[in-house]
Amino acid sequence: MTLNISNLELTGKNIVIVEDDLPSIRYYETLLKNSGADVMIFHTGKEFIDYLAQGNKPIDLVFMDFLVPLINGIECIRILRKDRKSTPVVMITAYSSEQAKTEAYIAGCNEYVLKPIYPEKIFFLLEKYLKSSISVPHSY
């Protein structure tokens, strides 16, 4: 099966990516460019927190890097959870330690995914949290 992001009906969905690694940002942009979703990218945790403080539009899903500059991903999740308790957050990281994973879940992330994250997993997460209609092979 060939996965095609344009098969997802994400029009009107707001997806936030908090990531400082340029190749990772390009990867997300490539996967999501034809989805119809509004994708917002923040290169530092501070940019994301400043955005939250403005009380802007709803956020439907957050892809959060663990180690982003200025304010790390764990602290970003804690701050997000003060006002947006139900916004799904997927922590994406290279940190495989149980301590890091536990810390992320305690902060309030919904998923803890190790890099590299493959398109099938991203599609699965989009379907799971945004309730789209794509059929994805569920091997997770």
Residue spans of the language-model regions?
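Conserved acidic carboxylate
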Residues: 19
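Non-catalytic signal-transmission and effector/linker regions of two-component phosphorelay proteins
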Residues: 1-16, 120-140
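Two-component/phosphorelay signaling modules centered on CheY-like receiver
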Residues: 22-40
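The feature encodes the CheY-like receiver
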Residues: 69, 97
